[in-house]
Structures are given as C-alpha cells and as structure tokens.
C-alpha cells in the first residue's frame, strides 16, 4: 500500500518556482551592475592617468646643423653631458661668476646679470641663501651710482667631479672710467646636473647645471 502523502498545492509550487526564477534574475542583475561599476571605475582611472601623462611631456633638444648655404648637414639628439665634461662646466661657472659680480650703470643689463645668476640656483640649495644675503647687503643698483665693476675669470680648476675652484679679478672704476681698485677673489662651487624638464628651462639652462653651494673670499 502506498504511503500517504499530502497532495501538492499548485499555488505553492508556482510561487516557489517564481521565487527561484526571480531570485536568479536579481542575482544576475546585481552581478552585471558590479561588472559595470568596475568597468566604469577602470575607465575613469585610465582617462585620468592619460591626462596626467599628457601634462608630463618631456622636451628633448634636437640639433640641426646647417652649412653656409643653410642646407642641413647633420641632425640628431645631443649626447648626455656628464660631470667629466669639465669644459662645459667651466664655461658655465665662468659666466655665473661674471653675472654675479659684474656691476654696470645700465639697469636693464644689470637685471639681466642677476637673472642669469639665479638661472643656476635652486631655492632649496645653500648657495641661493648665500647669494640672497649678499644682494640684500650689497645692492648692485646702488653701487652702480658711483662705480662699475668688470670681471676677469683667471682660472677654473676641477677639485672633483662636482666641486670647482674659481679664481677671478675684479676691476672697479668710478663713473668717469678711472680705475679705483683691483681685487682678486677665489670661490669654491659645488655643482649638480639635472636634466631639464620643460622648454623654459631648456632655453635658460640647457645642460641643467645648478650651483648647489658657493663660497668666495678675497685674496691678498
């Protein structure tokens, strides 16, 4: 004899089937929403990173050499300048001392000298504070009212790949051109090379040389 079993309720069975189907739809929709949100987040991150890279463009100088007729004869990228290339460093340091110490009655030219001095200085380096202090106590514009100073760089010697000794002579004249004094100075400059990162820096400081520290004294 077959065991007694309660007859199935068709309404309950239909309700259970509906619940199972609807629940699977809900779970599938939730999964797709999660995938969509993750995809949108990745797209936003990728777009933001692309925008960041677009603002970080690094300019590299490209040299084109021409002959007397203006015809291109050689092209290419300049070689990376290392500390061993003392000729370039010497020339740059000679210009630095000349710009820093020269005094002229032409205010526009004097400002150019000062600007050229600060092109090789960074705000975080000790040399900047020392030269700031010098200019605060020795205004070249005030000095130019009574005298001018011309600079002759006598010698630049590499003490290491980062430190150089600079000897120079200063010729002071009154506003009539009469020489009123000659003094010799010696400076010790510590330099560093940093690759230029933008067009403005390339124009002003193409090799990326900065004077990290600078001390100078008068010689007897």
From Swiss-Prot:
Coiled-coil positions: none
Membrane-crossing segments per the record: 35-55
Subcellular location, principal: membrane
UniProt KW Transmembrane helix keyword: yes
Domain of life: Bacteria
Pfam families: VirB8
Keyword set, alphabetical order: Cell membrane, Conjugation, Membrane, Plasmid, Transmembrane, Transmembrane helix
Entry protein name: Probable conjugal transfer protein TrbF
Originating species: Sinorhizobium fredii (strain NBRC 101917 / NGR234)
Lineage of the species this protein comes from: Bacteria, Pseudomonadati, Pseudomonadota, Alphaproteobacteria, Hyphomicrobiales
Encoding gene, per UniProt annotation: trbF
